[in-house]
Amino acid sequence: MNLTPIINALRKRCPTFERRFAGAAEWAGLTIEHAPAMPAAYVVPLREDASENESQNCYYQTITNTFGVIVLVSNAADVRGQGATATLDSLKPELFRALLLWHQEPKDEYSEIVYEGGSLLDMDDARLASQLEFSFETYLDLSDTYQQVELDGLPEFEGMDVDVDQIEPSATGRPDGRPEAHFKVEFK
């Protein structure tokens, strides 16, 4: 899942964070000793859930992409975390306005982003980390399959030869294996 457009949108639409949005690598590399300016947030992929193939004679599958926005706020002045949770609650509306019901481009390939919930990840005497979870759907269709690769490799359908074998209802009730007619169809 490509989260770069989401990070860019958050940087543009959330002025309180002063563009302090980064990705999974920066979150993974964050240490206790490293104290980024806060508030800061990290956008990380969480999971992809696939539905069953929704077509009986083609291919259409919905993929639910879930990502987290891990928000870091300062907890230095309040070891009980009440100030940090109040700060977090004041930042949520800004994040929601930046993401909820937004369609990434191209719009026909992405559903709108929805909120899935949140949880506290960590809290120490310096900072509080809370993860807000969001999701959007993408879609797989025939163009994403190997069958399409095979179909693309076939020559153009130019015509067909047809043999007609009449059913003999009085004798066997089946075709006798000897064609009674033949015709050719050409497409030009």
Where do the protein language model's features map onto the residues?
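A solvent-exposed acidic/polar surface segment
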Residues: 34, 42, 90-94
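Charged, amphipathic alpha-helical segments and their flanking helix caps
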Residues: 1-26, 47-188
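A short, hydrophobic beta-strand-centered structural micro-motif
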Residues: 36-51
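Short amphipathic alpha-helical patches
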Residues: 33-40, 118-123
